[in-house]
Amino acid sequence: MAASAPSNSLPPADSYQLLPEAQKAGAAEDALYEAQVKEIEEWWASPRFAGIRRPYSAADVASKRGSQHFRYPSSVMATKLFNLIREREAKGEPIHTMGAIDPVQMTQQAPHQEVLYISGWACSSVLTSTNEVSPDFGDYPYNTVPNQVQRLAKAQSMHDRKQWDTRRKMSPDERSKTPYTDYLRPIIADGDTGHGGLSAVLKLAKLFAENGAAAVHFEDQLHGGKKCGHLAGKVLVPTGEHINRLNAARFQWDVMGSENLVIARTDSESGRLISSAIDVRDHEFILGIADPAVEPLAETLQSMEARGATGAEIDVFEAKWVKSSTLVTFDEAAVAHMKKEGVSQAKIDEYLSATALDRDMGISRRRALASQFTETPVYFNWDVPRTREGYYHFRAGMEAATKRALAFAPYADLLWVETGDPNVEVAAKLGRAVRSVNPGKSLVYNLSPSFNWMAHGFSEEGLKSFIWDIAKEGFTLQLISLAGLHSTATITNELAKKFKTDGMKAYVEVVQRREKELGCDVLTHQKWSGASYIDGILGAIQSGNSSSRSMGEGNTEGQFD
């Protein structure tokens, strides 16, 4: 007997799947495609995507979706995160969290932190998909952080089910009086540089959404030249290249029909190299030489190498060359040239006003403009100081970082500027600059353990209020990226030292007694792990197995009752 006609209550894609194959060609597939386009256009017009710019159309997305309908739990978590961010941003209050490295830390954070953060640095140094740990140079396999996301998302689900089961055994009165812990906290994950070209970004974004990440941040460093944001040697990519990455992630999630949040991060506050000079938006910050007598650095180094110079000799020469050579922007070279020719300050100010009005003026137009004020051409060459890898020197700083944040803003849900030190005034200036152009746009702040917080002159009150002070300036999402790693190291260091001399006295004093005092549920780790929950499942499947239940008679955790 033939199957009944598909129900009209099903999503269009599901109804299409239930049609006989002979009926799928033609009108039915056209109807599904048109329904998809309409649904996408309405979705993009919702408050969720207010202010978000896309360089592609709803038809572009619909044609890439295929005929299946998927729902991803990470999209629900993304909506949960978006709503929380909007609520806190409106109040000028923070969502502050700590990086977690395992399910234990996730469960201990859940009652107190509203989101969960997973750091690429931590994954690189603690748990990669090849188990080859190393510094945060972004060179671990691209599924490393998505795997950790999946690990913690599954742990969240397990502890949610365990709690649900426990609460169903309570009376209604007991349930109403027993606090509910939301284990299903939105996960924010580190996407590094996207781990390759745009097709790699697409695949990475898909993996993150499938594995449970509500939001992912992507930074504007070069894949292959990536360093931790608090290390030297960072190489930036052109502004437009990073915008393409953000759009690739957004496109992938649009195809999936998921609302995951795109976080744009810039390392241009401290990144002193850039891979290309192709983008005019970067030209005002690219450094060069204004002295025609200076020989090209890369050519000189290659000549030294060809003559048999040692690596140490080349390194010494390069460091000396960079230190002794004055690197300037074109505008600085132009102003110095004008002063040398005796051009009046009024004319110099006229030139600077013109470049300030059009900060995206490219190098060719800047040369043409400068020629209107000088008798001879301005000598400026940004190829001379290029590194052996071909990178250009870049004027890092908050001015460059602010400009990049503004450029990324239309394509991102949140903005993150990696900074070199914790400073309320600097953060406030950045927040105001961004939000004056993008009202309501939330920012991310890394409360980094790479900062020596004790050496920055904070009073106890200032240290305590720092998070809330910058939240008022739009830094809604704040995180100690490596708190989980450092807290594990600290307690293990203390216990290891004391256990060596004091034996079990040390374990009781440092761990077990503290677990009981704090109400830490890992004190009874069998129960914490879900042994009672699994016993319940096995008991439902098979009767008469009470003697083999893990939490039955003989379970030593009864000693803690």
From Swiss-Prot:
Pfam families associated with the record: ICL (PF00463)
Residues annotated as the enzyme's active site: C228
Listed EC numbers: 4.1.3.30
Required co-factors: Mg(2+)
A cellular-component GO term for this protein: mitochondrial matrix
Entries under PROSITE patterns matching the protein: ISOCITRATE_LYASE (PS00161)
Biased composition (Basic and acidic residues): 157-177
Localization (cell): Mitochondrion matrix
Effect of deleting the gene: Abolishes growth and conidial germination when propionate is the sole carbon source. Reduces growth rate and numbers of germinating conidia on butyrate, ethanol, citrate and Tween 20. Also leads to delayed conidial pigmentation when grown on non-fermentable carbon compounds as the sole carbon source. Results in decreased tolerance to osmotic stress, shows reduced in vitro antagonism against Botryotinia fuckeliana, and delays root colonization.
Swiss-Prot/TrEMBL keywords: Lyase, Mitochondrion, Transit peptide
Uppermost EC category: lyase
Gene Ontology biological process: propionate catabolic process, 2-methylcitrate cycle
Sequence segments annotated as region (Disordered): 154-177
Pathway the protein acts in: Organic acid metabolism; propanoate degradation
GO molecular function, one term: isocitrate lyase activity
Lineage top rank: taxon: Eukaryota
Function: Component of the methylcitrate cycle that catalyzes the formation of pyruvate and succinate from 2-methylisocitrate during the metabolism of endogenous propionyl-CoA. Plays an important role for growth and development, but also in antagonism, root colonization and induction of defense responses in plants.
Family in the record: Belongs to the isocitrate lyase/PEP mutase superfamily. Isocitrate lyase family.
UniProt name for this protein: 2-methylisocitrate lyase, mitochondrial
Originating species: Hypocrea atroviridis (strain ATCC 20476 / IMI 206040) (Trichoderma atroviride)
